[in-house]
Structure formats: C-alpha cells, structure tokens
C-alpha cells in the first residue's frame, strides 16, 4: 500500500499523519482542519497519527467499557485502547502519538475512521487541558449553549429546532472546549446535518451546516456573567433544564 504523509501546522501544534492508503488522506485532512486556529501555548507540541493496515487489536481485559455503537475501551498504563470489529486505535498522550490499525475492508469507511480519530484525539487533548466532546454547540445572545447527550438522544434534532428558532448553531457533532477560571472557550467542527434532505424544513440550520468546511471556524466564549440559568453546577458551568 502507498503511504501518504501529511503535515499540518495548527496554531501551536505540528500534526503529522501517516496513512496506509491514499483514500484515507482526504478523510484525515478534512477532519483535522477543525483544530486550526490559536490554541493554548501549554498545548504546543507535535501530535502524530499513524495508520497501519492489518488485523485490529482487540481489548480483552475484564474492565473493558463498551459503547452502544460497538466500540470497546480499555485503559492501560499511559494509553487508551479503543477497538472495533474492523479497526482499532491506541492513544498515548505522553508520547504525543496515536496509532491506528485498519483492516482492508474498512479503509473506505470514513465514519469508522472519523470516530476512531475523534475518540483518540479527545484523549490526547484531555491530557493537554482541552476537551473534545460529542455535543451540539450553539450561540445565543453572546452566550454559548452546549447540548450533551448519548448517541441517539436527539442532539441533532434539538439543534435543528434551535436553529429554526433563530439560534446560531455551530455544530451538532463535536466541540472543542478550553475551560479557564472565568470562561469556557469553545470551537466547533461544522458538519452537514445527518437528516435526509426531505426531513429538513427550510431554515437557518440547513444553511449553517451546509457551508464550506474550510471557512474560518466560528468561536464562542461563555462567560460567567452570561450564564443566568438556575441550577448552578460549578462556575462557569450551569445546568439548563
């Protein structure tokens, strides 16, 4: 297989990608773009994403965690292993490296590759004081609105309703958060709504999520003063019900 080498300068980071198949190049280059922009100096360094062909490693410890989508998680000393029937990924934050093994049958499965990259990337960012979470992120009157829930809970559907009501929806998939003492700074990966076109009523949400992925990514800052909902959890987080 042809090895595709990709190098990106993302803010304070150098990101290196090695992939075993040319078809992975587009998936990774497209997805990694959401990191573009200024990041904390403390997070500076090099992140390496290494993709290999072969049989995926399977987690086999009794303390495995399983997800509804068929992923298995296992934490070992200094690393996180996430495995699937056709691929696996291992995040090693201390080494700044994530390694993926993908079976030939899964090379063109962009959703599987994106999920593995998201999970391992989230682990590596977490160890640098950042959080990549599966959530919907919107802006309303200068405040950030974060919608969190398990897969299938209705985040995308709620996002559509929020957009139709005039809120500035940024993403219904992944949000990158940087917590500070007084605010949570958030940036979003904008992606197309997963609903069939005949189920999406004309409105702001469709146009927001359909815009080009390579545009400047939206940013929103949630300050303590802008959060006035009851049910305080821990500043600057509040629970909105």
Where are these regions (language model features)?
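A noncatalytic interaction/capping subdomain that flanks phosphate/NTP-handling catalytic cores
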Residues: 1-151, 164-165, 175-241
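Conserved lysine of the Walker
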Residues: 155
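Post-Walker A alpha-helix
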Residues: 158-159
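Residue-level detector of anion-binding/catalytic polar loops
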Residues: 168
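Active-site flanking residues adjacent to catalytic metal/cofactor-binding acidic residues
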Residues: 172
């Amino acid at each position: 297989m042809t090895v595709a080498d990709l190098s990106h300068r993302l803010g304070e980071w150098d990101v290196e990608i090695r992939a075993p198949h040319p078809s992975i190049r587009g998936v990774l280059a497209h997805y990694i773009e959401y990191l573009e922009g200024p990041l904390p100096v403390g997070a500076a360094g090099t992140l390496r994403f290494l993709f290999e062909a072969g049989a995926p490693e399977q987690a086999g410890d009794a303390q495995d965690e399983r997800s509804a989508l068929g992923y298995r998680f296992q934490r070992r000393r200094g690393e996180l292993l996430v495995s699937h029937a056709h691929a696996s990924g291992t995040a090693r934050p201390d080494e700044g490296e994530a390694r993926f093994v993908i079976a030939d049958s899964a090379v063109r499965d962009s959703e599987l590759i994106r999920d593995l990259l998201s999970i391992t990337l989230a682990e590596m960012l977490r160890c640098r004081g950042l959080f990549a979470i599966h959530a919907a992120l919107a802006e309303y009157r200068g405040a950030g609105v974060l919608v969190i829930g398990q897969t299938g809970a209705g985040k995308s559907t709620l996002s559509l309703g929020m957009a139709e009501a005039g809120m500035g929806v940024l993403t219904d998939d992944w949000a990158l958060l940087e917590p500070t003492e007084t605010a949570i700074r958030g940036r979003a990966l904008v992606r197309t709504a997963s609903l069939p076109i005949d189920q999406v009523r004309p409105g702001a949400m469709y146009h927001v999520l359909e815009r080009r992925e390579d545009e400047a990514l939206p940013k929103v800052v949630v300050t303590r003063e802008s959060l006035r909902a009851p049910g305080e959890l821990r500043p600057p987080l509040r629970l909105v019900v």
